[in-house]
Curated annotation (Swiss-Prot):
Glycans are attached at N48, N61, N126, N173, N201, N452. SUPFAM superfamilies: Family A G protein-coupled receptor-like, Methuselah ectodomain. This is G-protein coupled receptor Mth. Residues 1-27 form the signal peptide. Changing D39N: In strain: Yak_23 and Yak_8. Involved in biological aging and stress response. Essential for adult survival. Keywords: Cell membrane, Disulfide bond, G-protein coupled receptor, Glycoprotein, Membrane, Receptor, Signal, Transducer, Transmembrane, Transmembrane helix. GO terms for molecular function: G protein-coupled peptide receptor activity. It is found in: Cell membrane. The keyword NADP does not apply. Residues 243-251, 301-323, 395-427, 479-517 are cytoplasmic. InterPro entries: GPCR_2-like_7TM, GPCR_2_secretin-like, Methusela_ecto_dom_1, Methusela_ecto_dom_2, Methuselah_N_dom, Methuselah_N_sf, Mth_GPCR. The chain crosses the membrane at residues 222-242, 252-272, 280-300, 324-344, 374-394, 428-448, 458-478.
Amino acid sequence: MKLFWVKRLLRISTVVVTLLLLQRTNAAIPDCDYYDTVDISAAQKLPNGSYLFEGLLVPANLTAEYEFTILPDDSKQKVDKHIRGCVCKLKPCVRFCCPHNHIMDMNVCAGDMTEEELEVLDPFLNVTLDDGSVVRRHFKKELIVQWDLPMSCDGMFSLDNREKTDQYTLFENGSFFRHHDRVTLNKREYCLQHLTFVDGNESSIRIAPHNCLISPSRMGQTVVMITSLVCMVLTITVYLFVKKLQNLHGKCFMCYMVCLFMAYLLLLLNLWQMSQNFCITAGFLGYFFVMAAFLWLSVISLHLWNTFSGSAHNANRFLSEHRFLAYNTYAWGMAVVLTGITYLADKVVENEDWNPRMGFGGHCWICTQSWSAMLYFYGPMVFLIAFNITMFILTANRIIGVKKDIQKFAHRQERKQKLNSDKQTYTFFLRLFIIMGLTWSLEIGSYISQFNQTWSNVFLVADYLNWSQGIIIFILFVLKRSTLRLLMESIRGEGEEVNDSEEEISLENTKYDRNVL
């Protein structure tokens, strides 16, 4: 019996020891993040189990044997057994991409620095302490260099703090704050390394941060935009095919759709980096068509207001059949002027705060990370949106007033005057809201909130709404009963061309006859 219990105890002891060893190997150092550790296998081990690493005494309880590495996504990868120490609990650490004597070239570790490179190396870093003060620290003498941690990603980009958009703050605890988008990164998401900077004929080597190229999934935006482009083509085709839709308002609407199609096409090419060979040209073309689209929206807004306010005949008196030519001169001409101003500013203005910087950062568009975008792009957009909103309110107010007037007149004359139901009226307001481009006003909020991650996620809904413009317009203006009826008549050869003077709004059945009043 005693022998039985002895064997039992031995088995239990063996299991316990095995579990402890496994814990020692796999659980690693208690209360210590893997990214706060350093490989100290080559350090001197003292009799009490502690290690002497680069002049720093690492106690035994802050060391452990590892046979894995933890990747940035927190998954484990098996490696050879080695000893690691939680040295960042004892002394501030700095996360390097490569060994401390290597230099980065094209975002790749390029090997040891030469003697000449070491002579021009600036070894100091600005480190922000917990109390908010900023001190200069020698990366090797005053900090622990962590260079054996897994790289955050394959594709990285460096920051140059000479640029206002590349400012950053490195904290004593190892976290990294990127100023332009106000994002805080941990040591899994960035690393530092020596990098050559060229300024005129002189070059210098400084320690520069490298961040991952984190690109959000483009699939959702791509699917929405391609669908939107197809819907735009279908909408334009319907308006070209159906003669009754080709009145003055319909022609303006088609011009708007052409501008929108070209702007979205260039945006899609930029999204998939298919316009890099003509990036600057693509950027200015995209700017031209976006501005032209907004200008055509202002034309449509003004034309709708004239139609419903009863002042269209006054416009006819002065412009007659040349109104469409006048509209074209205004929309395309102003778009050319705005594009020309932006082009000259891009070539002449030296101050980055006033330069649109077309093509900055490989994006074939105006640099939206600075306030110059407000001057050249969002400023004109705000003005035109404000104009469209004013026209929308005046037009909606006029429609409501006309409806009430006709109802009173019909009651007085005891005539049955059936107008659209409330549902139809609300639907018309929705269509009017879309065609006047008021949904674009959300784009301003998206621009202002780009540096706030929370609000950026909120306004992502607005971005998808704008990317879906072609789909929304197709549903509201083509897939409606009156347009489908006109389309069927045209297919059967029953359609007749409508004179522009009739001022029929082809986007909606709702209208009133001024002669009734």
